[in-house]
């Protein structure tokens, strides 16, 4: 199956956000490291950069936005889950051009590929609750 440029952008953004969360390195350093160590030709670079930079610059706001829908303390989140939720929350709040169903599906696929065994179920549940508020108009 051919992977879309946006999916590749999300996968690399996830790697970048995870790296940034763990290392606390400057986001430009993380971005440069990813760009030099990956084939970026089939990646939607603008989308990758928007996700990576958007999460890095708005992490606290994104965390506060998704927190009511988690059903557990944010400190209990696995680092991959946190990164996926931050990316998806950014997309839900800032990328109105992307349908919420696409955002949730992509987050689930990231969780299946990179998360713990049941992460995708948790991600799905949290985001499904979040869209009831964050994308209320789209759901009606």
From Swiss-Prot:
GO molecular function: RNA binding
One Pfam family this sequence matches: NusB
GO cellular component: cytosol
Protein's UniProt keywords contain RNA-binding: yes
Disulphide bonds in the chain: none
GO BP annotations listed: DNA-templated transcription termination; transcription antitermination
Keywords from the named record: RNA-binding, Transcription, Transcription antitermination, Transcription regulation
Family to which the UniProt record says this protein belongs: Belongs to the NusB family.
Known function: Involved in transcription antitermination. Required for transcription of ribosomal RNA (rRNA) genes. Binds specifically to the boxA antiterminator sequence of the ribosomal RNA (rrn) operons.
Protein name: Transcription antitermination protein NusB
Species in which this protein is naturally found: Alteromonas mediterranea (strain DSM 17117 / CIP 110805 / LMG 28347 / Deep ecotype)
Upper taxonomic lineage: Bacteria, Pseudomonadati, Pseudomonadota, Gammaproteobacteria, Alteromonadales
Name of the coding gene: nusB
């Amino acid at each position: 199956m051919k992977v879309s440029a946006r999916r590749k952008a999300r996968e690399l953004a996830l790697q970048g956000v995870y790296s940034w969360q763990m290392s606390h390195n400057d986001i430009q350093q993380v971005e440069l490291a990813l760009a030099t160590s990956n084939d970026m030709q089939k990646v939607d670079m603008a989308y990758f950069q928007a996700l990576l930079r958007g999460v890095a610059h708005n992490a606290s706001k994104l965390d506060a936005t998704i927190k009511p829908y988690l059903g557990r303390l944010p400190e209990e989140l696995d680092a991959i889950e946190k990164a996926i939720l931050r990316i998806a929350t950014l997309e839900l709040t800032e990328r109105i051009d992307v349908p919420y169903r696409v955002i949730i599906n992509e987050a689930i696929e990231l969780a299946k590929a990179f998360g713990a065994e049941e992460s995708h179920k948790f991600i799905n549940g949290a985001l499904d609750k979040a869209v009831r508020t964050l994308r209320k108009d789209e759901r009606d």
